Amino acid sequence: MTFSCLLALPLLSLLAALAPNPPKQLTYCNPINVDYGFCPIPNFVTQGKHRATADPAITMFKGDYYLFSTNQWGYWWSPDMLNWHFVPRKFLLPGANSYDELCAPAIWVMGDALYVIGSTYTDQFAIWKSTNPRVDDWHEAIHHFPVPAWDPAFFLDDDERLYLYHGSSNTFPTYGQEIDPTTFHAIGPKVELLTLHDDIHGWERFGEHGDNTFLRPFIEGSWMTKHDGKYYLQYGAPGTEFSGYGDGVYVSDHPLGPFTYQAHNPFSYKPGGFTRGAGHGATYQDAFGNWWHVSTITIAVKNNFERRNGIWPAGFDKDGVLFANTAYGDYPTYLPSQAGEDHAAGRFAHWMLLNYAKPVLASSTLGSHSPNFAVNEDMRTYWSAKTANQGEWFQTDLGAVSTVRAIQVNYADQDADVMGKQPGLYHQYRLLASIDGRRWTVIVDKSHNKTDVPHDYIELENPVQARFVKIENVHMATGKFALSGLRVFGLGPTAPPKPVQSFVALRADDQSGADRRSAWLKWQVSDDATGYVIYSGVAPDKLYTSVMVYGANEYYFTAMTKDRPYYFQIEAFNEGGISSRSAVLESK
């Protein structure tokens, strides 16, 4: 018996070694799935407690990605841009009287350390550094940083000179200043670098409709990137609450200017789709050297500062034009896998949304939070069950048996009772699939999950054939069982839609006196389309801006520079794929 066991042990080891490893997940889906903290500010939760963060920055350090964003009472690190590990940490000095624990943080690598500081209008904030940020191991680089800066960004140049960029105002400009990298005291005067010109640049106008209602627009969220000897000073505008919140960029041969407005602007922009907004972010490189842009996604329902984070493929074209590719940016997107990826072509996995506006059923409904709000591709609306009890459920009908490749479970905050970052929160659920709506198979079982997954995204190990998909609640992190989006991705049995017809761009001419910063885009309804993606740009081969449109055959495009010609294309999409694009349309 002993001899048999000894023989069995090597055999078991061999079988274990030969057993295939679980498939590595290849895609992610925005908003990124991290355990977002809840708003910690009492005045901001009068209409309901809710998760909130924004103003993200990512940098690589010692082979890992580090993500910091506003008021999370900590930060995340990841080895792969998919699995993010939270490190609890508060950076305010003892005695500080502020709810803004780490607002719009700046992060940069200098020497063998990662540095961080939050926004402050005083000189009472420390700069912290760590050589081992995978854990809470931080030390003061300077106890009181003597240069007050809101929305700060630090940039270390190739010659080891350090620069600070900052500003968040609808009155004052973006400033720049050289900082001593040893003492962290200012070198030379503060320089005015950028201001908004919303009379020329349409996207810089304040308001959801770009009409400067209520306030003048804000310039904020500085970030500096150096590429091929050029300095790209990035900024957010016009307001974090709006779908058109984006990032623009100016370019210079010197770190403190003078700067020239890039013709393609905003370079990061996502005014349509499930997630909206792509402003106040940071541009960084992955482990293979490819460029990405992380930025703020707006919700702004329970408070103007209810937001999430998104990551978009980015890059520089052959002419040095900085772009971020947000086309299908909230659909499954391939993670980085090798050097030289074509981010202008995008990283979209071509798994289509299968359940937009399709029939739904639910176990119960709370008030006006009706079930269709979980399939309408608007993260600002949501379905809520009456309780958080185990057994509450939500079901979506795909309309036809389809190939399901991935599912995103977006929870909403209904009657949450948490403020700030609270450890120990977790979601538990099961996902089931059915061909006929009667016989069900569990395809994802997270009934024993112990992590907080507010925007959980599951790439199935093997595609599933299904017409119906159901989620059953087991445990909620807080509040009632509520979903802003149960999004099912894959391919349906239908053919891709036919090309869009009768696409026109209506724009005022120079003599009309009407507003040339906007265009009215119209096209013929495609009966076989779920939605449309419009591409625009300042040259026929630089259509880097995209807008996703559902349920309409027109769009008011308000992001144009007044005296510049623009070029447009459009394509339709449905559950079966994407049509060919229309001919390029010039709008002078």
What does each model-found stretch correspond to?
Residues N376-V442, P454-A508, S512-A514, K522-Q524, ...:
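Aromatic, loop-rich ligand-recognition surfaces of beta-strand-rich domains
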Residues K450-H455, M548-Y555:
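Short, solvent-exposed loop/turn segments in extracellular or other extracytoplasmic domains
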Residues L432-A433, V525-G551, Q569:
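Extracellular low-complexity, O-glycosylation-prone stalks/linkers
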Residues V464-A466, A529, D563-P565:
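Extracellular Ig-like/FN3 beta-sandwich strand-entry sites
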Residues F557-S579:
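Beta-strand-rich modules
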Residues Y175-I187, E341-E377:
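Predominantly extracellular/luminal regions of secreted and cell-surface proteins
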Residues A19-F214, K226-G273, F288, T296-E341:
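Beta-rich carbohydrate-recognition and catalytic domains
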